[in-house]
Amino acid sequence: MALHGFLRGYRGYADTQALGDALKALQEEGLDQLPLPGSGQTLERFSRLAQVAGHDLRLCKLFEGHTDALAIIKELRCPLPPLGSIWGMWAAEPPYAKVRVRKAGQRLLLEGRKAWCSGAAVVSHGLLTAWDEEDRQQLVAVEMHQPGVTVTDQGWNAVGMAATGSVEVVFNEAWGIAIGQPGDYLARPGFWHGGIGIAACWYGGAQRLAEVLREQCGKRPEPHALAHLGAVDSALNSAACVLRASAGQIDQAPLADARLLAQQTRASIEDMTEQVIHHVGRAVGAGPYCKDPHFAQLMADLPVYVRQSHAERDLAALGELVAGEPSGSWQL
């Protein structure tokens, strides 16, 4: 309820700085302190992520990254982040952008370029994947306000999610500290829990789009729009059941390998999201696209956000896992 009330006070974000100000305000109110995955309240964590997504997907992108960074630092038993710090979590590894680290005493020196660093211009710290001298992946925490860090204006041309400022950052002899050991980022159980958290964000955006259609059908119950609403309800209801079940499984076995669970959940939520975009867009017509700024922004943002999935590549990975499962796993 506190989060819902807080978000009601914010309407519209002109740019990255406005998103950063809202994220800072959330942090100052303690609303960034989400239950950790596997703590027994994983569904509450997913619910809050979905709430922020339904409010504004661009703010959610920064909020999810900040809260994910806090969870990772806690999971890897590293020192608590500085009081009042705001974090970005950047783990994209396209072939053209790579950060290297080398040891310098108790700290690390960073060199290279990191792609798609959402909120880089407005966060105080970044948690990012880099590669050490033995070509092992290493998580590194970096203070952003130092001479060796340059936040560029390059790397993002999409209209959707533009205000997230997901630009490239260049590191030139920047200082950082290791978070965990090499390989820990992907090896920890929370990696897959975080992937389901992103799916909860997709869910929140899709749910908000569906509410626009529900409101329209309540005022004008036109048969074709009602058919679209029925399809949307079916998809959302199924997706909600999947997220609730996933949260329960994480809480029951927080240290278990959750890769299969995450791949299944993300595939389900992605499919639902695409169905909602399709049905809502066809049902509401041009009016909301042209006259409802929140709806128009969501319709621009959600297809971009959901592309954090790797589409058929992820489905192929899921199929490979399922092919190795014993028969009978689909029985009730």
Where are these regions (language model features)?
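C-terminal helix-coil-helix/basic helical segment that borders enzyme active sites and/or dimer interfaces
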Residues: 6, 11-16, 20-24, 238-270, ...
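DPxDG-like acidic metal-binding loop motif
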Residues: 113-146
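Buried hydrophobic positions in well-ordered alpha/beta secondary-structure cores of metabolic enzymes
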Residues: 110-112, 140, 171, 206, ...
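Generic structural signal for well-ordered, non-transmembrane alpha-helical segments
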Residues: 204, 230-237, 263, 267-274, ...
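Glycine-rich beta->alpha junctions and the first turn(s) of the following alpha-helix
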Residues: 157-238
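Short, charged, amphipathic alpha-helical segments
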Residues: 226-231, 256-264, 293-296
